[in-house]
Amino acid sequence: MATQTLLPPGTESYDPRFESLILFNAELELLADGFRWLEGPVWFGDHQCLLFNDLPNNRTLRWSECHGVSVFRESSDYGNGQTRDHQGRLITCHHRSRCLNRGEHDGTTTTLVGQADGKALNAPNDVVVKSDGSIWFSDPLYGLINDYEGGRQLSEQPAALYRLDPATGELNRMASDFDGPNGLAFSPDERKLYVAESGAPGALEPRQYIRMFDVSEDGRSLSGGEIFHKITPGWADGFRVDEHGNLWCGAGDGVHCIAPDGTLLGKVLVPKRVSNLCFGDRFHSRLFICASTTLYALFTNTRGVQRP
């Protein structure tokens, strides 16, 4: 049961720890509206702007405090999840071409990977870069099942979680016991990897949980994979981790804040389903929220882990 606190309207606290993470005088802001389905928010501190994808409209958009929303890329190849590598380059998951691309500083694009074991990937969904430079991404079937998010295509292999070494091109399948791997993020010390399990496409009862894996000392293998937290209503989608190790996860009724021990601390209620989010702005403490057709933001009293 939610507790009564001095939190702003539109937030619910289930644990006293949540109150220190939220500002009493900062409410949810609507930044822009009128899109179709937003995904892949990533903050560019060097340009003080947010990039995000309007997936069905096949375009990448740019938002800044001074200029609002503009088109960054007119044809995004149905880009989904995004992040930056340690050189500041944009890494994007693409549905249409079923690959992972890197945007270079000179404006060109490099395809990092499009196959596993000689077969096409499904539809890379979300991505995170580890401190050693390795790129981890989820590859479910969601982007293959309709024309709305890239075009129907046949799957050539099971849904899986991958690790890519961009220096050598070595690709390793880290886990394949998923119905639908989705958002993913490392704990601040990178000893844990959290992965959303959203279930098989079209399932009548989608999976609603986040799994937690132990990362080996060399960062090249996983163990465990037990259920860390169950999301309700809706299902776990994109999420980020803050400096305290809390997960801020997109859900059916907004953003759920989950402690490292798996406890639901509180919720930021959002009028529309949240697909993805990221921390950004000057101190990396503003939460940018992609919610269906709308972009929201909320100033918080915590900071995202300082990683792309």
Where are these regions (language model features)?
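Blade-edge beta-strand/turn elements of extracellular beta-propeller
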Residues: 18-30, 67-75, 106-120, 160-180, ...
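Beta-propeller domains
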Residues: 20, 45-74
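Blade/loop signatures of beta-propeller domains
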Residues: 1-27, 306-308
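Short loop/turn segments immediately following beta-strands, especially the blade-tip
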Residues: 212-220, 300-306
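A detector of repeated loop/turn-to-beta-strand junctions in beta-rich toroidal repeat architectures
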Residues: 57, 97, 151, 155-159, ...
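A short loop-to-beta-strand structural motif that recurs across blades of beta-propeller domains
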Residues: 59-61, 99-101, 160-162, 209-211, ...
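Beta-rich, blade/repeat-based domains predominating
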Residues: 33-48, 75-94, 98-99, 117-135, ...
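C-terminal closing repeat unit and adjoining cap/tail of repeat-based domains
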Residues: 18, 251-308
